[in-house]
């Protein structure tokens, strides 16, 4: 069984994760344009949940397409 996760960069599509990567993650942080563009959002697959840096928000999940882009409706 291989998991489907959404991946950035755009266009954001659900892609099959490589064997051994059984988590989808969403990582968000602010860059220099945060006030005008909002947070930078990175989506992808992982074998283990990425460690969170102090300025990041990281969430992980383990079901197909469970990491849609926060600003997009799951399609």
From Swiss-Prot:
Record's GO cellular component terms: extracellular region
Gene Ontology molecular function: acetylcholine receptor inhibitor activity; ion channel regulator activity; toxin activity
Keyword set, alphabetical order: Acetylcholine receptor inhibiting toxin, Disulfide bond, Ion channel impairing toxin, Neurotoxin, Postsynaptic neurotoxin, Secreted, Signal, Toxin
Query: Which Cys pairs does UniProt list as disulfide-bonded?
Result: 5-24, 17-45, 30-34, 49-60, 61-66
Q: In which tissues is it expressed?
A: Expressed by the venom gland.
State the compartments where it is located.
Secreted
Question: What PROSITE patterns would the database entry show?
Answer: SNAKE_TOXIN
Q: Which InterPro entries match?
A: Snake_3FTx, Snake_toxin-like_sf, Snake_toxin_con_site, Toxin_cobra-type
Q: Pfam family example for this protein?
A: Toxin_cobra-type
Source domain of life is: Eukaryota
Which positions carry the signal peptide feature in this UniProt record?
1-2
Q: What is its main location?
A: secreted
Q: Which family does it belong to?
A: Belongs to the three-finger toxin family. Long-chain subfamily. Type II alpha-neurotoxin sub-subfamily.
What is said about its interaction partners and assembly?
Monomer in solution, homodimer in crystal state.
Function, please? Binds to muscular and neuronal nicotinic acetylcholine receptor (nAChR) and inhibits acetylcholine from binding to the receptor, thereby impairing neuromuscular and neuronal transmission. Reversibly blocks chick and mouse muscle nicotinic acetylcholine receptors. Blocks muscle type nAChR with an IC(50)=30 nM, when heterologously expressed in oocytes. Also binds with high affinity to alpha-7/CHRNA7 nAChRs. In addition, shows a weak inhibition of neuronal alpha-3-beta-2/CHRNA3-CHRNB2 nAChR (IC(50)=2.9 uM).
What's this protein's name? Answer: Alpha-elapitoxin-Bc2a
Q: Can you name the source organism?
A: Bungarus candidus
Q: Which lineage?
A: Eukaryota, Metazoa, Chordata, Craniata, Vertebrata
